[in-house]
Amino acid sequence: MYSLTVYNEPEPGAWPNKTVGLLYDQDMPLTAGRFSCMLGPVRPAGYDGPFIELSDDAHGILTRDYHRDPSAGRRVDWDIEVIDHAGLPAAPDNSDGSVAAALRAALRGARDTLAIAPLVLQERTPAELADGQSLSHNVLAPPYRTGGATYGYSMQDAVYCLGAFALEPDEALVINLTHPACRFWNFTLWNQFMSAVETEYSRSGINCGSAIPNSDGSTTIVIARQLLEHPNALSTKDHAEGLMAFRWFFAADMPEHPSTTVLSVDQAPRTVS
């Protein structure tokens, strides 16, 4: 599954607060293994293919690639061509005023980013943010949809569920849930910068293609600082604290709130049930 999303820029350098347009792979049919789409303020005459209408505040494009098996999948190669630049050269404006404005926007972007990251990893005393997201450790907040309004770069068709882990060397966090019908779901362990804790030597996430379900259709995920024997086990690579995130795309129903239990490593499940 892949997509192309256009976000706005409400002020120079500010994080987006609106999704301008979004196209998924299913919106862009393949012809001889290739697809195309167009972006612009007005749909070109005679063109009836995939199109995103750009608003005056449209600013950035983000592409995404999701694979059930990344080792077997192929990433999308994107070719970008300027068809019409309002009669102007498709070249950056390197005048003093333009460069100064770009530097001011970069400073605003850095300030907005550093106001968020590094994120709070966990709180020993349970707390809740205004949007309902939990700061308690070893729990996940209720799943939520973002819709077209956003702060940052979330996906309007996705459901998110976020939380934090804090584990001792002899502890394991066991997550249980039943997923709704959806095109794709995944679960990822993050550091405080919303990046995978490490991917060079072992996986930091699991998805609908790699997870082994229980006999009743539910999914159990076992997290510990070491890699345990469960087929859906994830290691924090000995990180004592971090973040965790579920995503569901095109979920038929709102996912249930995942349950979490902290057990000793010796008591953690080793097999699916």
Where do the language-model regions lie?
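A compositional/structural signature for long, glycine/proline-rich flexible linkers
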Residues: 1-273
